[in-house]
UniProtKB/Swiss-Prot annotation:
PANTHER family: ZINC FINGER CCCH DOMAIN-CONTAINING PROTEIN 15 (PTHR12681:SF0), ZINC FINGER-CONTAINING PROTEIN P48ZNF (PTHR12681). This is Translation machinery-associated protein 46. GO terms for molecular function: mRNA binding; zinc ion binding. The keyword Transcription regulation does not apply. It comes from the Eukaryota. It comes from Saccharomyces cerevisiae (strain ATCC 204508 / S288c) (Baker's yeast).
Length: 345
């Protein structure tokens, strides 16, 4: 059906009104602000058009929400894991592929679908180990060092906050590299192989300046250091050392040592060896009776241990702990009282 005349007249009037409002404006086709104003005027003059646009926008959002809900229900995604030594940004987010990731820039995985295609392919015709051997730590900066550490050791596997001392020593001494192995068990080391927070890698120039500053510092010998420390002492409270007082101190020291040994020997129980030696010293016939004894102890007559047994019984009746050793002292200690009580029981 042809449009009614009333509607045609109304549309023509609106069009004329729009032309009148924008008449005389400069730079209609150049200025973005003017174009924006013209669109605003046109939308105000035709409210149904703006209403249709908003309705389509709401319909589009509703369809997107339904599609996201359908994917979440029928296409579940398992937790995406990262292997040790792999940068998460080199992997495309699995939820982003399905359109369900709502983390945006905070997601640790990449939202670029071309990230996997841009990865450099490994050249099978070249051996890269020689390049790594020449790529020593002397040419690295702090950023390169952290990347190599992450590539070699991967994500930390331990819960301790302590950093491996061998790792720090290797980094500070410039011995760390691609082929460095931790002496504390290699990859099974229980401590962290990562730089502590606030660590700053010193450059070769800084190390050279430190060495020069150490070389410029005054050096003294051990004798000079001792004399310097002696000069700091308060001489009014000390006695100067002379030959006479040193000899007297040595004599007193020897006497005190002898008295301490006598006091200790009077308290402790004599060993079997000491009893034998004492008996041989007191009884001269003990040596003469055994002078004809053959060298081979497996051949010969039995010993008369009567005196030794009496000495043991005499020692057993004393108040202290009993004999603590036997023979030459190499045997384990034992308690005669405990042994006698065990035999009686």
């Amino acid at each position: 059906m042809p449009p009614k005349k009333g509607k045609q007249a109304q549309a023509a009037g609106k069009k004329k009104d729009n032309v009148d409002k924008t008449f005389g404006m400069k730079n209609k086709n150049r200025s973005t602000k003017v174009q924006k104003y013209i669109k605003q005027v046109q939308s105000q003059s035709d409210p149904k058009k703006e209403e249709m646009r908003l309705k389509k926008l709401e319909e589009k959002k509703r369809r997107e929400a339904e599609e996201a809900e359908r994917r979440a229900l029928f296409n579940p995604v398992a937790d995406q894991r990262v292997r040790a030594g792999v940068d998460p940004k080199s992997m495309v987010c699995a939820l982003f592929k399905l359109g369900n990731c709502n983390k945006g820039a905070k997601c640790k995985f990449s939202h670029d679908l071309n990230v996997g295609r841009r990865m450099e392919k490994k050249d099978l015709y070249q051996d890269t180990r020689s390049e790594k051997e020449n790529d020593t730590m002397d040419n690295w900066d702090e950023e390169k060092l952290r990347k190599v550490i992450l590539s070699k050791h991967g994500n930390p596997k331990t819960t301790t906050d302590k950093v491996c001392k061998y790792f720090i020593e290797a980094v500070e001494n410039g011995k760390y590299g691609w082929f460095w192995i931790c002496p504390n068990g290699g990859d099974k080391c229980m401590y962290r192989h990562s730089l502590p927070e606030g660590f700053v890698l010193k450059t070769n120039e800084q190390k050279r300046l430190e060495r020069e500053s150490l070389e410029k510092q005054p050096k003294i010998t051990l004798e000079e250091f001792i004399e310097t420390e002696r000069g700091k002492l308060d001489k009014s409270k000390l006695t100067p050392i002379t030959i006479a007082n040193f000899a007297q101190w040595k004599k007193d020291h020897v006497i005190a040592k002898i008295n301490a040994e006598k006091k200790l020997s009077s308290k402790r129980k004599p060993t079997g060896r000491e009893i034998i030696l004492k008996m041989s010293a007191e009884n001269k016939s003990f040596e003469t009776d055994n002078a004809d004894m053959p060298d081979d102890v497996t051949q010969g007559s039995a010993w008369d241990l009567t005196e030794f047994t009496d000495a043991l019984k005499k020692a057993d009746h004393q108040d202290d702990g009993g004999i603590k050793d036997y023979g030459d002292g190499s045997n384990p200690t034992f308690d005669i009282k405990k042994a006698n009580s065990a035999t009686l029981a």
